[in-house]
């Protein structure tokens, strides 16, 4: 029998690679042979997983995240398509600031560069209104322009 083990991360506890290593150790103790593959759904930690499979970094950029902290993020070249993981800027682990005080506006600095944006693991819940606002879409409440829309 051939066994293939695929695992994504267990958010807040183990990365996909750590899950795989734990399973591998237990299988080896019990003389179980298998092949092991960390995987991702395109959300948080996608960049790490893709790079483990040899996906090349196309470009590294300095941009501000959802609380204004400058970060270095990477765009990957996946078979000619440029990939960006949005959680690098709006991720759950980027800040302890209340979610209701955050939005996706910081993604406007990078949105035009990738062909594919991995979603998931976001700390925001503004439905993209912050991003749309930065891209020129106006939102109003009681006929008053909302400058920095938040939930």
What residue ranges belong to the model's regions?
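N-terminal loops that bind phosphate or other acidic moieties
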Residues: 1-151
């Amino acid at each position: 029998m051939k066994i293939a083990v695929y695992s994504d991360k267990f958010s807040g506890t183990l990365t996909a690679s750590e899950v795989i290593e734990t399973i591998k150790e237990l299988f080896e103790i019990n003389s179980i042979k298998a092949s092991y593959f960390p995987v991702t759904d395109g959300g948080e930690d996608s960049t790490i997983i893709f790079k483990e499979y040899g996906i090349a970094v196309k470009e590294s950029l300095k941009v501000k995240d959802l609380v204004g902290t400058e970060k270095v993020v990477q765009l990957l070249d996946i078979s000619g398509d440029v990939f960006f993981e949005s959680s690098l800027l709006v991720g759950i682990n980027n800040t302890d600031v209340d979610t209701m005080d955050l939005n996706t506006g910081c993604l406007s600095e990078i949105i035009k560069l990738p062909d594919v944006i991995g979603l998931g693991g976001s700390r925001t819940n503004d439905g993209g209104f912050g991003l749309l606002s930065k891209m020129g879409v106006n939102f109003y409440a009681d006929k008053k322009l909302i400058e920095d829309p938040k939930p």
